[in-house]
Amino acid sequence: MQFSTTPTLEGQTIVEYCGVVTGEAILGANIFRDFFAGIRDIVGGRSGAYEKELRKAREIAFEELGDQARALGADAVVGIDIDYETVGQNGSMLMVSVSGTAVKTRR
C-alpha cells in the first residue's frame, strides 16, 4: 500500500478512484508522563514521551487507513491529510486522524 499527501503518484496512472478512507487513533496520556513532560518543556528539552505517543497514534491511524483502502481493492491512498488534536477533559487524550482517497494504479 502506497500513501501520498499529493493527489498523484509519480510514474503511475490512477485508473480508478475507490472512495474516501479514514483512520483515527485516540490515546490517553498518563498523568505521570504528563507531569515529567511538563518539567522537560519548562527547561527547554524535548518530550520523548509525547513524541512516542504521537508516533504510535499516527501508526495506528495509518494502519486503519490502509485496511479500509485494501477492503475497497485499492493499492494506494492519495491526497492524505493528517490532523492532530487534544481531546477530553483538560486535553487528556491525543487524537490523530488521517483521511485520503483510495485509488487503483497502473505503472
Swiss-Prot record:
InterPro entries: UPF0145_dom_sf (IPR035439), UPF0145_YbjQ-like (IPR002765). It comes from the Bacteria. Signal peptide: none annotated. Gene3D superfamilies: Hypothetical protein apc22750. Chain B (3.30.110.70). Pfam families: YbjQ_1. Belongs to the UPF0145 family. PANTHER family: UPF0145 PROTEIN YBJQ. This is UPF0145 protein YbjQ. It comes from Escherichia coli (strain SMS-3-5 / SECEC).
